[in-house]
Curated annotation (Swiss-Prot):
Binds 2 [4Fe-4S] clusters. One cluster is coordinated with 3 cysteines and an exchangeable S-adenosyl-L-methionine. Monomer. Catalyzes the methylthiolation of N6-(dimethylallyl)adenosine (i(6)A), leading to the formation of 2-methylthio-N6-(dimethylallyl)adenosine (ms(2)i(6)A) at position 37 in tRNAs that read codons beginning with uridine. [4Fe-4S] cluster 1 binds at C12, C49, C83. Its cofactor is [4Fe-4S] cluster. It is found in: Cytoplasm. This is tRNA-2-methylthio-N(6)-dimethylallyladenosine synthase. It comes from Marinobacter nauticus (strain ATCC 700491 / DSM 11845 / VT8) (Marinobacter aquaeolei).
Amino acid sequence: MAKKLYIKTHGCQMNEYDSARMADLLKTGEAVEVTDNADDADILLLNTCSIREKAQEKVFHQLGRWKSLKTKKPDLIIGVGGCVASQEGQAIIDRAPYVDMVFGPQTLHRLPDMITEVRTKGNGVGVVDVSFPEIEKFDNLPEPGADGPSAFVSIMEGCSKYCTFCVVPYTRGEEVSRPVDDVIAEVAHLAAQGVREVNLLGQNVNAYRGETHDGDQMDLAELIEVIATIDGIDRIRYTTSHPVEFSDALIEVYERVPELVSHLHLPVQSGSDRILAAMKRGHTALEYKSKLRRLRKIRPDISFSSDFIIGFPGETDKDFEDTMKLINDIGFDMSFSFIYSARPGTPASDLPDDTPMEVKKQRLSILQDRLNQNVMDISRKMVGSTQRILVTGLSKKDPGEYAGRTENNRIVNFRHENPEVVGHFIDVEIVEAYPNSLRGVPVSSELF
């Protein structure tokens, strides 16, 4: 009888990709089927994120809920992976001895061996592997299975920027790029399964420098041009980018590759040069704006989104005003924003912070109100326009409708008579705008 696997994922798109690969790996190695119900599982995996405040407590809170399942089912295997696992290692098992194994983002390919070791040793002997074997995991993962017409493809791991607030270099290691041929093979394999859109992933994806078969190197701009030639791939996205690595070559590729969507997520974190320097971001607000303006000249319809940290240590009213000015100047679309929380072991965690939490919350509210207004303004301007959307499946709100995404990542709900519309592009007229979605009407029955 097949063992049942349940995976709970916290955090970023990279973690979503890693969780999917864990499932692929375990389904290939033994008789395993994925379940949506933790109560039914024989193997429970928690893929963790350490970016936000109290990440560790969130992990132990979830593990506490699983402890009772272990009591009822002693042979149940519980594993913790991801960035909190990389940070905490053995400390997770010390605090939660019912956890059987702890593994980092770079060692998830060793899961089958770890599970075998747990079964051999029996309960009470935790297995920990949070080493950094660079790109080894990709050499030991099975070919990915497609799950719909859009897919994530990890092209690099880690970050070497060491921004003062960020824990990523300590949990995922230095930047390591996958070889070009490996990336191309994975994208081609997904395309053969009906994938029409790929989202290239990396903690600092535009720092990609992949080795070619002849020992040369290829950057992200060149990789995008190659991927665009793969039959069946009609949309390309990438995330997450760093402004310093947003090169002239990458800007220019938007002029040559129509498959590259007219949307860019480029985290800036702050609009204050003083705060950017304290964060060790390596650029000014003006340098950031100049790159986006160059890109907008090439793609006038492009939309931009970003990440913003509010209340970084020492942030003054003037610093916050500079951030709001940047938001107003650029007109950011859907973006992420949150109050700064110190991550253990990062340089910023040692900085004095005398800004009251109430002030930080007020600033965040002002910023989010402005961003939400931008989102609605952009959505309303889309009403009456014709948008080509990739149909991803049934609508989550109404199973009698279908849903798809625009280039600028808007969800569009619409009705259609042909069930074969899923996995295809169609043209729809946008007729209504809502806070989190759009409503569309197909302009023809033609599928692309």
